[in-house]
């Protein structure tokens, strides 16, 4: 009798739960040994990885996959090198598990502190890019979590080949293969099952398009770490150094159009707009960036009319919305109304103004004189990241190793009894 998708996912979930107890108590040395061995296995399996990836690319071309998606799907030699380097980098990162902080004596004589512990089992749902398999698996492994990886159907052969290398590394370190499992069915019912197993899965991390993330957020019976959009702003204040502002705003938009930290809306104080915008527009237009502006913007530079929808849009493309605002308060109001709580930056030399912006803008990252494209786990010193969260519960901003752990209280006494002495 053929196993149903639900039975298959239940089997994966049960195995992951059992494996989480093993990896959760594994030593740092054992986890690092698994990561290094997995890197060696990837290096030795380049031919197998390339062959598996070619199957996915051929299927993608046959199915009319767009060139940009085919590019994301490709495992080039450089990308395989990057995956190997990524595994070794995660192995070199400090292990957050077991770290104790804030130990202090209470009047009763007991000591109270907090210890970092793994979350347990993490389900990762993602699209296209097979290198996400390595990023997710390595971070979950190092943070003491088991993981179930459900990649896009277009990368199924690549993901299987990568998972085989990871499991070789786990075996060499004496850890169960179920610490990292790839869902090997392309049936979409598997996603529904994965997000509906709170008895086996502790948290879901979706990485992909808005439709995928909205569906998971709506239907999941398991907590979700996510962000929907990256509608990031740069505000050029009346106290900005304009040379700095031109460079920062240009980099924020053009570093890479397709990342969630790219600037999508530029806000400019009305008192500097006439001096700032013509040169800024010239630079963007030379780069081929399409400008969409409010009426005050269009009175100063050539731009298409911006609509209400533009302020709500994450373009992920060479398109930029520009609005001239009355000042700091209106800029903050605009960001909090239209933004996605991801990353927003102010360009200013005025400390009080910068402090107000950072205190009142409701985003996971707030920046001063810095392009929003710096919103990245590597740039923040976290090493690799599993994603960026715009939620306020558990993790916010780039989610690295520590974001894949939680805290429990540690209480140490020497026979103290409550209700006696100073209690």
From Swiss-Prot:
The broad enzyme category this protein falls into is oxidoreductase
Q: Does the keyword NADP apply?
A: yes
Q: Which reaction does it catalyse?
A: L-glutamate 5-semialdehyde + phosphate + NADP(+) = L-glutamyl 5-phosphate + NADPH + H(+)
Q: Which GO terms describe its cellular component?
A: cytoplasm
Question: Which Pfam families does this one have?
Answer: Aldedh
Pathway(s) where this gene product acts: Amino-acid biosynthesis; L-proline biosynthesis; L-glutamate 5-semialdehyde from L-glutamate: step 2/2
Report the locations given in the UniProt record.
Cytoplasm
Q: Note the PROSITE patterns from the entry.
A: PROA
Q: Which NCBIfam families match?
A: PRK00197.1, proA
In which organism is this protein found?
A: Pseudomonas putida (strain GB-1)
What is the name of the protein in this document? Gamma-glutamyl phosphate reductase
Entry's EC annotation: 1.2.1.41
Source organism's superkingdom? Answer: Bacteria
Task: Tell me the function of this protein.
Answer: Catalyzes the NADPH-dependent reduction of L-glutamate 5-phosphate into L-glutamate 5-semialdehyde and phosphate. The product spontaneously undergoes cyclization to form 1-pyrroline-5-carboxylate.
| GO biological process terms on file | L-proline biosynthetic process
Q: A GO molecular-function term, please?
A: glutamate-5-semialdehyde dehydrogenase activity
Classify the main location: cytoplasm
């Amino acid at each position: 009798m053929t196993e149903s998708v639900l039975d298959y996912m239940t089997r994966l979930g049960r195995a992951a739960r059992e494996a989480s107890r093993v990896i959760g108590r594994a030593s740092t040395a054992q986890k690092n040994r698994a990561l290094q061995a997995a890197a060696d296995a990837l290096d030795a399996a380049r031919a197998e990885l390339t062959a598996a990836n070619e199957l996915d690319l051929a299927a993608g071309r046959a199915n009319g996959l767009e060139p940009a998606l085919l590019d994301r799907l490709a495992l080039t030699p450089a990308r395989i090198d990057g995956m190997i380097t990524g595994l070794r980098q995660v192995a070199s990162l400090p292990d957050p598990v077991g770290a104790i902080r804030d130990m202090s004596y209470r009047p009763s004589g007991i000591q109270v502190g907090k210890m970092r512990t793994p979350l347990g089992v993490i389900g990762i749902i993602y699209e296209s890019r097979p290198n996400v398999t390595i990023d997710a698996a390595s971070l979950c492994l190092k943070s003491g979590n088991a993981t179930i990886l459900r990649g896009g159907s277009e990368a199924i052969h690549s993901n299987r080949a990568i998972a085989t290398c990871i499991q070789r590394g786990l075996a060499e370190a004496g850890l169960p293969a179920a610490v990292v499992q790839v869902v090997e069915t392309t049936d979409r019912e598997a996603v529904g099952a994965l997000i509906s197993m709170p008895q086996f899965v502790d948290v879901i991390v979706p990485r992909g398009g808005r439709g995928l993330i909205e569906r998971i957020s709506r239907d999941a019976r398991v907590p979700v770490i996510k962000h929907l959009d990256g509608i990031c702003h740069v505000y050029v204040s009346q106290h900005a150094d304009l040379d700095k502002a031109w460079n920062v705003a240009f980099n924020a938009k053009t570093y890479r159009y397709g990342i969630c930290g790219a600037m999508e809306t530029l806000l400019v104080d009305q008192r500097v707009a006439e001096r700032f915008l013509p040169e800024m527009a010239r630079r963007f237009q030379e780069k081929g960036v399409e400008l969409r502006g409010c009426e005050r913007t269009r009175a100063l530079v050539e731009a298409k009319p911006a609509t209400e929808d533009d302020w709500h849009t994450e373009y992920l493309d060479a398109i930029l919305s520009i609005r001239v605002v009355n000042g700091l308060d209106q800029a903050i109001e605009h960001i909090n109304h239209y933004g996605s709580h991801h990353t927003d930056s102010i360009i200013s030399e005025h400390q009080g103004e910068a402090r107000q912006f950072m205190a009142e803008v409701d985003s996971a990252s707030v920046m001063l004189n810095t392009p929003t494209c710096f919103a990245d786990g590597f740039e923040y010193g976290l090493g690799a990241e599993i994603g960026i969260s715009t939620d306020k519960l558990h993790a916010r901003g780039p989610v690295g190793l520590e974001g894949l752990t939680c805290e429990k209280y540690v209480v140490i006494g020497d026979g103290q009894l409550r209700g006696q002495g100073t209690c």
